[in-house]
Amino acid sequence: MRNKNIIMLLMSSLILSGCGPQPENKESQQQQPSTPTEQQVLAAQQAAIKEAEQSAAAAKALAQQEVQQYSDKQALQGRLQEAPTFARAAKAKATHIANPGTARYQQFDDNPVKQVAQNPLATFSLDVDTGSYANVRRFLNQGLLPPPDAVRVEEIVNYFPSDWDIKDKQSIPASKPIPFAMRYELAPAPWNEQRTLLKVDILAKDRKSEELPASNLVFLIDTSGSMISDERLPLIQSSLKLLVKELREQDNIAIVTYAGDSRIALPSISGSHKAEINAAIDSLDAEGSTNGGAGLELAYQQATKGFIKGGINRILLATDGDFNVGIDDPKSIESMVKKQRESGVTLSTFGVGNSNYNEAMMVRIADVGNGNYSYIDTLSEAQKVLNSEMRQMLITVAKDVKAQIEFNPAWVTEYRQIGYEKRQLRVEHFNNDNVDAGDIGAGKHITLLFELTLNGQKASIDKLRYAPDNKLAKSDKTKELAWLKIRWKYPQGKESQLVEFPLGPTINAPSEDMRFRAAVAAYGQKLRGSEYLNNTSWQQIKQWAQQAKGEDPQGYRAEFIRLIELADGVTDISQ
């Protein structure tokens, strides 16, 4: 009888597994023609939930029967206690089976080629997250190509740490003391012999761990039913414990959770009470719907209550982004986050999961909240984000940072910025201190890439008939390929500061770092289906990366080469 019941349970589980999520397709807020109707989705969900409840009831009944039949009741009692968890897991799985392509990404087009004669200025917010790299990795590890809108090339290029020292002699001297350094180089673009690649590196000054100000952190954790699977809440719990290890006595931590309602799982407590903090993290359980708005409100209340003047005051939101009840209007949430940002409480977001993953929301509120967006797909990624790069995440050395590059038509005919599509600013926004822009954390390394068409190289766009003659004039400006301006505010400042750098036209053999990041840029562009790569193959990209791998103490570059191989294999299968 016992074996028969167990077999029945296994069959039920297999049926449920067959109903699981299918490979995600590009949604970008738009439904594909094959997407089920709302009625079909609801009917499928209800049927799956009903079957899940029946299976859960059978599991509970079997456990009760065994407790009554066998003498070792204490050991068997655990199976009875697991039955409700089984039921919640089945319901969560059923919720997502009917519409696998529900992840939401903000749609955008690649930056176009621009003529310097008409558009000499590139203006953008100087900020970068790295969440896209980990999310793309998750797709490839599942044997899937990512939706193009999930691929943000600048986040992929900037995923890799740099060994560049801010005191390096390659740094371009600044006209006044600034919280960052700059360097650049020019080299032929590997994917097009008629193009030149400009790489600009910006490195923020770092701070030693003992120099960190006191922190007032609030963990805001989604504990709704959609978070029950291993790659969601359990992964977040393990990840947060990595951050707990780094806490000091002067750091205060509170934990707020939200599902159908929100609650304080742990009132603010000193970071020295690690056992108590970890116990509160372990006690979290996933169940119910997702009232993200109410959770944010309660988290901000806790952050305000424990506010440390001159310290770090930040909310760390961990969720799959599935805000489905409460204040779920994006504009309302953005308004709340913006208001709190002005009071000194910032917000970082950590995404997990795949189906129903609302990345567009996660990225947006992190930007508005002057924080960072990260995607956690493995515990190793959590180690990188919450441990190795903790200072970059928590300590701001410059805020509202904007960059503007003016290209000299005497040297440059056309340019195309690689990445940063979602961080473009209007030209007049550069000098407007009321326009919000990105923040740079301590020790953060940012790479900018531009594909240039120099005079003498074959242009994509015909020269304007009435354009002025751009022959080299006899002036100092002929020594300048471009002019870089960076505007920023100090963390507590109200007025922006300005620093300017000349960029010369000398082309040298590319450095190892430039060759590797060019390979990474090609990888990202190819995943997006870029028209600018001239049929560059995955094997070519792999070769470029292997030849420029260099020292790789964390193994990130070796892993990247493996991802190129996966992308090549997935592409072959899909063709």
UniProtKB/Swiss-Prot annotation:
Pfam annotation, one family: VWA
Family: To Synechocystis PCC 6803 sll0103.
Protein known as: Uncharacterized protein YfbK
Stored SMART domains: VWA
Gene assigned in the entry: yfbK
InterPro entries the UniProt entry points to: Ca_channel_alpha-2/delta, Uncharacterised_YfbK_N, VWF_A, vWFA_dom_sf, YfbK_C
Region entry Disordered, spans: 19-42
Biased composition range(s): Low complexity: 28-42
PROSITE patterns: PROKAR_LIPOPROTEIN (PS51257), VWFA (PS50234)
Domain annotation VWFA: ranges: 216-394
SUPFAM superfamilies recorded: vWA-like
